[in-house]
From Swiss-Prot:
SMART domains named in the record: IG (SM00409), IGv (SM00406)
Subunit structure: Forms disulfide-linked heterodimers with CD8B at the cell surface. Also forms homodimers in several cell types including NK-cells or peripheral blood T-lymphocytes. Interacts with the MHC class I HLA-A/B2M dimer. Interacts with LCK in a zinc-dependent manner.
Task performed by this protein: Integral membrane glycoprotein that plays an essential role in the immune response and serves multiple functions in responses against both external and internal offenses. In T-cells, functions primarily as a coreceptor for MHC class I molecule:peptide complex. The antigens presented by class I peptides are derived from cytosolic proteins while class II derived from extracellular proteins. Interacts simultaneously with the T-cell receptor (TCR) and the MHC class I proteins presented by antigen presenting cells (APCs). In turn, recruits the Src kinase LCK to the vicinity of the TCR-CD3 complex.
Phenotype of the disrupted gene, per the record: Cd8a-deficient mice prevent the development of class I MHC restricted cytotoxic T-cells. However, maturation of class II MHC restricted T-helper cells seems to be unaffected by the absence of Cd8a.
Keyword Signal: yes
Native source species: Mus musculus (Mouse)
Sequence ranges on the Extracellular membrane side: 28-196
Protein name: T-cell surface glycoprotein CD8 alpha chain
């Protein structure tokens, strides 16, 4: 027969093996999933805004809402409210004066609603929720709640297309183009029409004057000097003699 010590050790080993088998067969607790909506909110001043955090999975405790002001330079978020999952206990942050800016409620066992009573610059920023399950803290995605920017768009001005005339036909001139102004009394064409007439004429006159000056300069330089004095004839002996006149 086995001794009492041997039987005690065998029993402990058997119990230890069963506990290991049972522990390995148990499934690990599933991490909760946080869904928050809407994903983004563009609100107007004074508007009421509802933010919903839906918790999928088992949560031992409640849900907390946190807030990061858009104008704040501090990186850490601010606690807003805590809602318990088992009873209707709601805890606000007294420093933030959350009870006047916000209101909260637990819609169902897994939906926690945070309401912005009146949207203002004081509660403009980024919101997210958080839960604790099995001593682990989980966070949702961030929802930006910002002021809506009203973009002013100007209507495009529609211009009537000008009629297209066939090729080779003269376009009739509108009477208001060369009509004298009502407040100015004068004779002849208007200044707007005078400049279109005299400017080309003045340009042509200047071009002709420059051409004439250039022509005179070139002609003066190209003239050759002709010597009319007779040259003396050279004799074969090397002495010059007077040139003979040709009749």
């Amino acid at each position: 027969m086995a001794s009492p010590l041997t039987r005690f050790l065998s029993l402990n080993l058997l119990l230890l093996g069963e506990s290991i088998i049972l522990g390995s067969g148990e499934a690990k607790p599933q991490a909760p999933e946080l869904r928050i909506f809407p994903k983004k909110m563009d609100a107007e001043l004074g508007q009421k805004v509802d933010l919903v955090c839906e918790v999928l999975g088992s949560v031992s405790q409640g849900c907390s809402w946190l807030f990061q002001n858009s104008s704040s330079k501090l990186p850490q978020p601010t606690f807003v409210v805590y809602m318990a999952s088992s009873h209707n206990k709601i805890t606000w942050d007294e420093k933030l004066n959350s009870s006047k800016l916000f209101s909260a409620m637990r819609d169902t066992n897994n939906k926690y609603v945070l309401t912005l009573n009146k949207f203002s610059k004081e509660n403009e920023g980024y919101y997210f929720c958080s839960v604790i399950s099995n001593s682990v803290m989980y966070f949702s995605s961030v929802v930006p709640v910002l002021q809506k920017v009203n973009s002013t768009t100007t209507k495009p001005v529609l211009r009537t297309p000008s009629p297209v005339h066939p090729t080779g036909t003269s376009q009739p001139q509108r009477p208001e183009d060369c009509r004298p102004r009502g407040s100015v009394k004068g004779t002849g064409l208007d200044f707007a029409c005078d400049i279109y007439i005299w400017a080309p004429l003045a340009g042509i006159c200047v071009a002709l004057l420059l051409s004439l000056i250039i022509t005179l300069i070139c002609y003066h330089r190209s003239r050759k000097r002709v010597c009319k004095c007779p040259r003396p004839l050279v004799r074969q002996e090397g002495k010059p003699r007077p040139s003979e006149k040709i009749v």
